[in-house]
Regions:
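Conserved core of the sugar-phosphate nucleotidyltransferase
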Residues: 1-48, 55
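Residues that scaffold the ATP/ADP-binding catalytic core of kinase and kinase-like folds
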Residues: 9, 39, 81, 90, ...
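Glycine/small-residue-rich pyrophosphate-binding loop that anchors the diphosphate of NDP-sugar donors
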Residues: 25-32, 119, 231, 249
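Catalytic cores of nucleotide-enabled group-transfer and carboxylate-activating enzymes in metabolic
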Residues: 27, 39-40, 58, 149, ...
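A short, conserved alpha-helix in the catalytic core of glycosyltransferases
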Residues: 50-65
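Extended, small-residue-rich solenoid/repeat segments and analogous flexible loops
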Residues: 62-166
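Glycine-rich hexapeptide-repeat left-handed beta-helix
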Residues: 163-304
Length: 304
C-alpha cells in the first residue's frame, strides 16, 4: 500500500509464490534486536526445502502485532555477491557509477575505465586524472590538481593545483599543500610537503616535514628507519637538496640551506648553511689513459 506495509516474504520455490508486484527480496533485513531475538525462535522449517527461512520473520512479526515496511531500490544497488565473479560485477557497477558522478561534478577523467576509486575518495572540481591511476581509501584531492598516469594514492590529502606523477606513490598520512609537486618514481609516506615544494624525480620521502618552496633533488633518500624505530626529519623553507643525497634521521635542516649533491647528512644543518659530506675529488692527470691502455692489452691477451 501507500505506506509500504510488508506482511510476508515468500520464497520463489514455495507454492504460494506469485510475483505480481514486480518486487523481490534483496536479502537485507533491519530489525530491533529484542524483537528479532524473540521472533527468530519461532521460525519453523515446514516448507518445500525443509529450511529455516529468516524471511519468515516478517510474517511472524505481523502475527504478533509488529509492523514491517520495505524500501525500494534499484536492482544493481543490492545485487547478491556469492562468488568472485559476482563480486567483480558489483565492483564494476560501483566504479562506473563513481566515475560518472565525478565527471558530472567537474572532474576530468581522460580514460575513465582505467581509473579506480575507493568508496570514500573525494576529488574536487577542475582536477584532471590521467589514465591508469588507482585511489586507495582515505584520499582527498582539492581543486585543479593533476594526477598523472600510473600513480597509486592512499590515505593522502592533496591541496589545490598540485601535480602528482607519473609513476608516483603517495602512502598514508601524506599531506601536500597547494602547488606541491611529486614527480615520477617518487614515494611519499607520513610526510608533509608545504606550498610549492617539489620532489620531481626518483626519491623516497618518509616521516618528514618539508617547508615551503623547498626542492628535493633526484635520487634523494630520507633514511628514516634504523632497523627498529622510525625517525623524523624536518626540512625548512627555501631549502635546496642536491641530487643523490641521503638525509639520515633524526635530522633538522634550517631555512635557506643547501645540501650538496651526493652528500650523506646525519647532523643538523643551521639555517642558510651549505652542508657537504662526501670524499674530496682527486684528478690524476694522465692516469686514465694509462689504465685504459693497460686494460686493452689485457683484453687482447685474453682473446689470443
Amino acid at each position: 500500500g501507500p505506506k509500504r506495509t510488508l506482511i510476508d516474504i515468500i520464497e520463489k520455490n514455495e507454492p504460494e509464490y506469485n510475483l505480481t508486484n514486480g518486487l523481490s527480496n534483496s536479502g537485507i533485513l533491519l530489525a530491533r534486536s529484542r524483537i528479532l531475538a524473540d521472533l527468530i525462535q519461532k521460525i519453523k522449517n515446514n516448507n518445500a526445502k525443509r529450511e529455516y527461512y529468516l524471511t519468515d520473520i516478517v510474517k511472524l512479526a505481523a502475527k504478533h502485532g509488529y509492523s514491517s515496511t520495505y524500501v525500494q531500490c534499484k536492482e544493481d544497488e543490492c545485487i547478491g555477491v556469492n562468488s568472485q565473479l559476482e563480486l567483480t560485477i558489483a565492483e564494476k557497477k560501483f566504479q562506473d557509477d563513481f566515475r560518472n558522478r565525478l565527471m558530472a561534478s567537474g572532474v576530468s577523467l581522460q580514460s575513465p575505465e582505467t581509473c579506480f576509486f575507493s568508496f570514500d575518495t573525494i576529488i574536487k572540481v577542475g582536477c584532471v586524472i590521467e589514465p591508469y591511476v588507482v585511489f586507495g581509501t582515505g584520499v582527498k584531492v582539492q581543486g585543479f590538481s593533476i594526477i598523472r598516469s600510473f600513480s597509486y594514492i592512499e590515505g593522502a590529502q592533496i591541496g589545490q593545483r598540485c601535480q602528482i606523477g607519473p609513476f608516483a606513490r603517495l602512502r598514508p598520512r601524506t599531506r601536500l599543500s597547494d602547488e606541491a609537486k611529486v614527480g615520477n618514481f617518487v614515494e611519499v609516506k607520513n610526510a608533509i610537503l608545504a606550498k610549492q615544494t617539489k620532489a620531481n624525480h626518483l626519491s623516497y620521502i618518509g616521516d618528514a616535514e618539508l617547508g615551503e618552496n623547498t626542492n628535493i633533488g633526484a635520487g634523494t633518500i630520507f633514511c628514516n628507519y634504523d632497523g627498529i624505530n622510525k625517525h623524523r626529519s624536518v626540512v625548512g623553507d627555501n631549502v635546496f637538496v642536491g641530487s643523490n643525497s641521503s638525509l639520515i634521521a633524526p635530522l633538522k635542516i634550517g631555512d635557506g640551506s643547501i645540501v650538496a649533491a651526493g652528500s650523506a647528512i646525519n647532523r643538523d644543518v643551521p639555517s642558510e648553511s651549505l652542508a657537504i659530506s662526501r670524499p674530496m675529488q682527486q684528478n690524476k692527470i694522465g692516469l686514465g689513459k694509462k689504465i685504459m691502455l693497460k686494460l686493452q692489452k689485457l683484453a687482447d691477451k685474453i682473446k689470443r
